[in-house]
Amino acid sequence: MFKDGSLIPYLTAGDPDKQSTLNFLLALDEYAGAIELGIPFSDPIADGKTIQESHYRALKNGFKLREAFWIVKEFRRHSSTPIVLMTYYNPIYRAGVRNFLAEAKASGVDGILVVDLPVFHAKEFTEIAREEGIKTVFLAAPNTPDERLKVIDDMTTGFVYLVSLYGTTGAREEIPKTAYDLLRRAKRICRNKVAVGFGVSKREHVVSLLKEGANGVVVGSALVKIIGEKGREATEFLKKKVEELLGI
């Protein structure tokens, strides 16, 4: 889904509004190997405070699911950069799995990551996604055993998303040793590309993870924090942060 060495920015759809999200995506497009677009949810348990607050801001401002598809559709008028929706299962359930995935495909979505859908319960979802032409992305954590990592890789048609730490998302000072241990195991076991996320906030994080074999690195909280502070005026600050991460 993306070339090796890619930075994969994450933004929450509708924070602070749909047009601003589109503007941010277009501004970051030249730096991105792929883009993760989060679907706001009222109980984002896998996310840390920064991204939780972005979900709440979007919902408070009246976000509706159709706005995420509008953002992707408008983005597709300008770019072919792959977009992966990152969502909890509830919005999919409410819309209906096939309806959700069909609309996602029609808007130009390439892949989907359902944060709270365990791989062992994802067979039907994965089959429908394949029928609709949407690639699936699954999470693996530092405590994921090799056998489960193999199942995750087998169910994945996009890339395997390696969670660098235990707990929720959020920028950290250091990437823990357990993240590198997981990355080495994944490179040995997985046939799909792997991207590492959760906690990436510095240039040295990106460099060390790519050097260790990650195909891509996801950065979310460090960008979402800027949007929380700058709102609609965040564009140039986002670009500056991404350039810092890439060493430009």
Curated annotation (Swiss-Prot):
UniProtKB keywords: Amino-acid biosynthesis, Aromatic amino acid biosynthesis, Lyase, Tryptophan biosynthesis
Transmembrane domains' residue ranges: none
Pfam families linked: Trp_syntA
Pathway the protein acts in: Amino-acid biosynthesis; L-tryptophan biosynthesis; L-tryptophan from chorismate: step 5/5
InterPro entries linked to this entry: Aldolase_TIM, RibuloseP-bd_barrel, Trp_synthase_alpha_AS, Trp_synthase_suA
Highest taxon, organism lineage: Archaea
Protein family according to the UniProt entry: Belongs to the TrpA family.
Role summary: The alpha subunit is responsible for the aldol cleavage of indoleglycerol phosphate to indole and glyceraldehyde 3-phosphate.
Name by which UniProt lists this protein: Tryptophan synthase alpha chain
Record organism: Pyrococcus furiosus (strain ATCC 43587 / DSM 3638 / JCM 8422 / Vc1)
Gene expressing this chain: trpA
